[in-house]
């Protein structure tokens, strides 16, 4: 893996609480997150894998690893973007996610792009 990535992949995240899929009384809080990946660099790159670390408000951690995202391993030309939506279920109304995406450039160089931590929070405060 290269210390300096061969291209720049920008990651942005939007989250949403899903009350219609949640059951707070059963400690079941559903969230959707939309990830946008944009290739702002000079080289084409393909997403190989993802690694998520999901933490609830009580400190319970789930790790998710796998190839690509939502069944795809998109290839992004310079200037291109790819957007997908997925979800996570927590046992608490608040939590966080962070992780990494592993990519390979069109010259065969592997590199990792960090996904900064983002918050998952139910829109309602439960008493």
UniProtKB/Swiss-Prot annotation:
Transmembrane segments: none annotated. Gene3D superfamilies: ApaG domain. Residues 3-127 form the ApaG domain. GO terms for biological process: error-free translesion synthesis. It holds the Pfam family DUF525. This is Protein ApaG. It comes from Acidithiobacillus ferrooxidans (strain ATCC 23270 / DSM 14882 / CIP 104768 / NCIMB 8455).
